[in-house]
Structures are given as C-alpha cells and as structure tokens.
Amino acid sequence: MDESATSVLYEIRVRGLLGETLLSAFPGLRARALGTETVLTGPLRDQAALFGVLGLIEALGLELLEVRRTRP
C-alpha cells in the first residue's frame, strides 16, 4: 500500500527560526518561517511517528506551540 495513502498530514509549529542543522533532524517534513516561528509540515504514517517527532522537539529543547492534523 502507498504510504501517502495511509499517512496523515500534520502541521507542527515551534517557537523560533530553525537553522539548517536543526531542520536536518526532521527529514520528510517541509519547513517554513512564519514570523518568529517555524512551521513543519508533512505526512506522518501513524501516531507513533507523530510522537517520535514531538519527542525530538522536546529533546532539542524547542518550544512546541501547536500541532494540527490538516488532512483526514
């Protein structure tokens, strides 16, 4: 089965503008600056993958502002 068919698109917002080194920790996610925040967007295959990204955000000391599921 195509992974994109089973993945859910998420938008994850963190405080601060992430440099290339930090962004490289999130392969498969696109990043865009929005004011003084960074928005990471991309498909995650399941909640375990989402929790993995959230755990990495915590481990890197980033401040999580918002998580949104943007596609069913």
Residue ranges and their predicted role:
Residues 9-72:
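Amphipathic, hydrophobic secondary-structure cores in small proteins
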